[in-house]
Amino acid sequence: EPKLPSAFAVVNPNRLDVESGEGRLAAVGVAFLLAIAINRVLRDKGWYGERSEPNLMQWLDLVALGTVCDVVPLSGLNRALVTQGLKVMAGRGNPGIAALADVGGVDETPGAYHLGFIMGPRVNAGGRVGTPDLGSRLLATNDHAEAKDIAIRLDALNRERRDIEQAVLDQALDQMTDDPDAAGAVAFVSGQGWHPGVVGIVASRLK
């Protein structure tokens, strides 16, 4: 195994010396399990003797959102985290996620589809074509008015992202149509001014 960095702990289920079998966890799942482990150590050491212990389960809605949007296999622990996270999400305790559901027209109990195709793209839209910190601000705020405002902005950015993506995709497909050699086992397309925030999505749609 390559030399590990100098650190108190290198938390990665894909390390060669880890036998957990959880190498397909999304990063958000790894972070959540780390938080649980740290919380357990603090509890055992009496840290919460005169302090309130945090309810980590309330964050499972964020874990579910991140897991689905990372497109990891929804099996094993990933599936369990998403299943429980969707239950938390249905309670609308996170103002940002509730606002996302509202602007996305999700008026039913959310499922993995809603996370992957309705809510996730809106969270990511700020980073693709707008202000990168909008998504994190939305998910971190406890202010319902602020959450609504940010969600509306992200919804608008997501529409803009779709328009830009479609324009780039159309140009890429035109190139493949005009050049028979471009549509072989490996396709090469390029364009002046293509937005870097959508080229990855377009590439995946050319497969």
Across the structure, where does each feature detected by a protein language model lie?
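Histidine/acidic-residue-rich catalytic or RNA/ligand-binding cores of hydrolases
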Residues: 4-5, 132
